[in-house]
Amino acid sequence: MRRLVYILSVIILLCAGCSRQQKAPVKIPLTSAHRGASTIAPENTMASVDSCIKYGVGNMECDVCISKDSVFYVLHDSTLDRTTNGTGDISDWMSADIDTLDAGSWFAPEFAGQRVLRFADLLQRAKEGGLRIAIDYRNGGLQEMLSLIKSKDMLENCNFTFSKEEDIKRFRELAPEVKTLQAYIRSESDIERVVREVNPDIAVVWIDSLNPQFVEKCRKHGLQVLALVLGTDDKTADNQKAVDLGVDIIATDRPVQFIMKYGKATP
């Protein structure tokens, strides 16, 4: 009888050990808020930034535009029409006039008075709140933008995406020490070409294109993987897919909801 109990005990311990080995810690990706926490506050406003910081979102994606008098602003569209009470291209406006615009009322009455966010103010608040910034560069003033980022001591806390090859080359010349250059990769077969031509640090890939082989190939080329899971509709399945694939960053329009379900990024 004792021998039987002993054998059963050993079997139970072995099974428990196997179970522990199978349940490896799940890697939670860094959450990147597309245009800020844009489902609970107007996109690219300070209210949206503050919501990211409040809920522990690790990264905020933004587009940087430039005014007529060379002041940098955070705005997704090139025009002011959709998200402010102004009209026309932001590049045709002086900063003093841009600063008077309402960038919150379109979203909800309680956000009336939110302003078009100056990029310098975003950098300062991000620095204070421990928020990384992912910059989608448009055009104009690259050297000046980098100088502004350096003046805020935020260069190591920014990721950069460029759409033009000449901008990428210029960026590498101006900031060779930065290791957070992002590049879009549309398919697994495109990895070698992008690595050869752009030499990025982070692969930006739509979630529909990702699979284990894609991720593994990126890793072999020394790339981190950012999964694009954009849209305000239900992304439950896509979010889970990104987590299961072990991506490094997930870009989402619902960052707070992702954090509430999965928690903050695994160190």
Model region roles, listed by residue range:
Residues 17-267:
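Phosphate-group recognition and catalysis centered on beta-loop-alpha active-site segments
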Residues 1-26:
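Bacterial Sec-dependent N-terminal signal peptides
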